[in-house]
A protein has these predicted regions:
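Short helix-capping segments at alpha-helix termini
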Residues: 35-40, 71-74, 134-138
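Alpha-helical elements of Rossmann-like donor-binding domains used by nucleotide-donor carbohydrate transfer enzymes
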Residues: 24, 28, 48, 63-66, ...
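Residues within well-ordered alpha helices
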Residues: 32, 67-68, 107, 129
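Substrate-recognition element of Asp-dependent hydrolases with the DxDx(T/V) motif
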Residues: 80-86, 92-96, 101-133, 139-146
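A metal-dependent, Asp-based hydrolase signature
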Residues: 40, 51-86
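Active-site neighborhood of HAD-like aspartate-dependent phosphohydrolases
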Residues: 1-46
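Short, Φ-rich (hydrophobic/aromatic) sequence segments
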Residues: 44, 87-88
Length: 146
């Protein structure tokens, strides 16, 4: 019987709850834009932003630009900044590894098994998540979308 030499993990929704983080972050962004004066319905705006993500990709960096332009005909930077700042704060507060991820990675690494991550996220975003979660020291290789 051959010994396992390596394990490869997906990042989003395997090591961390990406969709929960995204939900909280987008809802916070909508609230931030409303607090800045954008006159929109909170619930339908959340649904519309999710639809934009589904159309353009979950890692798209221009989603709020598209949303604001659809609402008022141009990108008002006051609303954009409010949305981005609220999004980032909520993202950081809700970016958490699933239970036992650290314990499992530590046990695998201590047993000499090489560990890797594969992600469909762009490199910068994947590495940001890995560092936010303090998991960077476990992985021998990280392979990303780009």
């Amino acid at each position: 019987m051959s010994k396992i030499k390596g394990v490869i993990f997906d990042l989003d929704n395997t090591l961390l709850d990406f969709m929960k983080m995204k939900e909280f972050a987008v809802k916070a962004a909508v609230k931030g834009m409303i607090e800045a004066g954008l006159l929109v319905d909170e619930e339908s705006s959340y649904d519309e932003i999710v639809s934009i993500y589904e159309q353009y990709g979950w890692e798209n960096q221009k989603v709020f630009d598209v949303f604001i332009e659809k609402q008022i005909g141009y990108v008002e930077h006051k609303f954009l900044a409010a949305g981005i700042v609220a999004y980032r704060r909520a993202r950081e507060a809700n970016l958490m590894a699933y239970p036992n991820v650290n314990k499992t990675l530590m046990a695998l690494a201590k047993s000499g098994i090489k560990l890797g991550v594969v992600s469909d996220a762009p490199s910068r975003e994947a590495w940001m998540r890995i560092y936010y979660l303090n998991l960077y020291h476990y992985f021998d290789v990280v392979i990303t979308f780009d």
